[in-house]
Structure formats: structure tokens, C-alpha cells
Amino acid sequence: MKKNKWLLLVLCCICGFNAQAQQFVEDSIKVDGHMRRFDVFLPEGIKPDAPLVFYLHGYGGGIYRKNPMVETASREGFAVCIPQGLKDPKGKPSWNVGYPFQEGWKVDDVKSLSKIAAYVQKRYHLSRENTFLTGMSNGGEMCYLMAYSKQKAFKAVAPVAGLTMVWMYRDLEACKPIPLFEIHGTEDRTSEWTGDLDNKGGWGAYMPVPLAVGYWVAKNRCTKEETERVEGLNKENGHYIIKHRFTESATGCDVWLYEVVGGKHSTHTEDIKTGDEIWSFFKKTMKE
């Protein structure tokens, strides 16, 4: 009997250690009849009420655990939720941002992501006040759509290589200011820096990046622009970054735009420490 008790104790210790060492948790909830899958990254030693950052994949992508936010989270002590988009009418996992080929698709990703956020906050004891949203490409477009919406789940957004669709710019009026940070390459041929007002690329008409970001500068009533040029981390590719920071906002919501000169369609981790830069921006907005 004693031997069995000792064996049980040893097994409990081993299981407890493995549970503590496991940093990624697979989870899901049902929203509007769809199972919404996501992974949650919980760094070692994470504290109750820690911040939460959502990372959204690009068009056709999936749950990518090696995204720029995870490494930063492991050092800074915040959680990362990595959701999986549903398949659109073309059969590609994506976020419903109103591309022409998504017409008639009834998935409401604003609602779904808000529901996931509420669940993850409660289930993993994370901060409701300090939950943020970032994403790449199609995930970046979703960041803009979320910013325009009436959602209350996300305190700030940081699209990377993201676009504002013309329909958003013309038809939507943001109900409140929100801190926004865009990182974008000037040589991006998928999500053009100069926009695509004639829908030559097939994604739908979208705004030039500086003009799209300018909407939020005005909406947030920023009164000062600071500009800084820095060399990229990779000295061989010749890229450099112009950091446009729009500050002294009357609403307390700053806007940043990092113009990666020479940068293509990517997360720009060769040019800057993307995860650290995004976290630095989010951190400025945090509620203590």
C-alpha cells in the first residue's frame, strides 16, 4: 500500500512538472456553429492578470507558433493567442475582411475573435483591460476591421503588411479612437504601399498605406509627428526604416507607422525586432 502511495506521488510530480513545462495549449470554442481553434502560449512563470496578445495569420495560413510575438512573450511574460481562420469560399483559411471573393461568406470574425478573447481571458486568468491584436497581411486587414468596429475586446492594434480596404474607409466610421501601429514595406508587391484603388491585384480596392494610417492620426487627434531614420538589422539588403510616430494625442491614442524602405511582403524580422517593437507600442497603452 505504501509502495502504491509513493508511486502515485511520483507520477503526480512528473505530471505536474510536464504540465508546467508545457507552454502551448491547444483549445477551441464554438461560435455561430463553427468550432474556432486556437493555441495559447503561456510563458514560464506567467502571472495572473498578465497581458494577452492575439496574433492573426495571413491568407491561407494557420496556427504559426514561431510568429514574432512568441519569443518576445517568453521574455516579457505575456500570453499569446494564435487563432485559426476558417476556410473561405475559395477554400483558404482566412479572416473575413470583405475581399470580392469572400462575398456572401457569413462568417463574422469580429464577433468570433471577441468571443475567443473573452474565453481566453477567463479560462487562463489573463487581463481583460490589456488584450491586444496584431496580425500579418490578411491578419493585418482584420486588425483594421477590428479597429473600425464597435468591439471592446482589444485595447490596441498592430497590423503588419496590412491594408485598409476602400469599402472600410468609405463605409465605416470608427466609433472610438484606438492606438494603432502599422509596419509596412515600400516594395511590398502583395499589399502595395501605394495602394490599389483599381483592384488590379484581385484583393479588392484598398487605400495607400500612409493615407489609411492618416485616418487614425486624425481620428485620434494626434498633434505631433516625430520622424526617425534607422538602419535595418540586415546590413546586406540595404533596407532602412523611417519611424513615423504621431504623438501627443488628445485622446491618449498614439499612432505609429514604420516605413520599411525596400521591404517586401513579410513580418520584417530581418530588418527590425518586430515582436519587441510591437510589444513596446502595446506596453505604452497598458492599464496598470
Regions found by a protein language model. Give the residues of each.
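Active-site glycine-rich loops that stabilize anionic/oxyanionic intermediates
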Residues: H57-G61, G263
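Short beta-strand/loop motif that positions the catalytic acidic residue
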Residues: E182-H184
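Cap/lid segment of the alpha/beta-hydrolase catalytic domain
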Residues: G85-D108
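A domain-start/cap signature at the N-terminus of enzymes
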Residues: A19-L52, G61-Y64, T72-R75, F101, ...
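Alpha/beta-hydrolase active-site loop
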Residues: Q102-Y124
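Alpha/beta-hydrolase
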Residues: F54-L56, P83, V160, V260
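Bacterial Sec-dependent N-terminal signal peptides
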Residues: M1-Q23
